[in-house]
UniProtKB/Swiss-Prot annotation:
GO-annotated biological processes: 'de novo' CTP biosynthetic process; UDP biosynthetic process
Gene name as annotated: pyrH
Protein name: Uridylate kinase
InterPro entries xref list: AceGlu_kinase-like_sf, Asp/Glu/Uridylate_kinase, Uridylate_kinase, Uridylate_kinase_bac
Task performed by this protein: Catalyzes the reversible phosphorylation of UMP to UDP.
Amino acid sequence: MLHAVTDSSASGPADGQAGAPKFRRVLLKVSGEALMGSQNYGIDIDTADRIAREVAAAVKGGTEMCLVIGGGNIFRGLSGAAKGMDRAAADYMGMLATVMNALAMQTALERIGVQTRVQSAIPMTTVCEPYIRRRATRHMEKGRVVIFAAGTGNPFFTTDTAAALRAAEMGCDALLKGTQVDGVYSDDPRTNPDAERFDQLDYLDVLTRDLRVMDASAVTLMRENAIPIVVFDIHKTNGLARVLAGEGKCTMIGKMKSDAAAV
């Protein structure tokens, strides 16, 4: 049974603290845009360092962590294709952007003493390991953070789908999606103040209402493997720790109702 994450503003530990982790192993999906901070392009080192500290605290608390980072802060394949580029070539460029972000996050984590491995779906052994599932699992069992780069290694698949695939392969208890807002809304709350916010959603509700928190293939893969998706604000201080402890403001997506009721 899936339990909702509750808002810690009502009860729980004091500010700046969080309870014991509720998940043994999780995949954290971070958008490339999240790494920009207040910049319009590229990687903001202060933002990468802050996210690294959150991940380090989670590992220290006993949670096994793996990450998938998008590449939209550097290059987005769909945008390139929309401007006339060959879609496959544009997607490969986007995959290379995720490798750059993964290396930046690895550097941020290792700078604070967290052993980290980058595994790429596109082999580039000079800079990182190739993706090998059993090796990635062993890394996490030894307390290392694993960052999966280059998406699925195939064009026409998003990094959301790559995150869902890796979460299923790694046997993760949840996929945590760190975004720019504190959950799933009916519309972009930054442009529509009347957008409805959801605390809980069924997988099928996300698909039938076209809420676009993740692409349909990613949500379907999570549904088929019964892995909950937790959407939270990656920029909120201690946001990751609170979500891992079953607290904090977020949206939980999972098996909330029967398939017949969800349609």
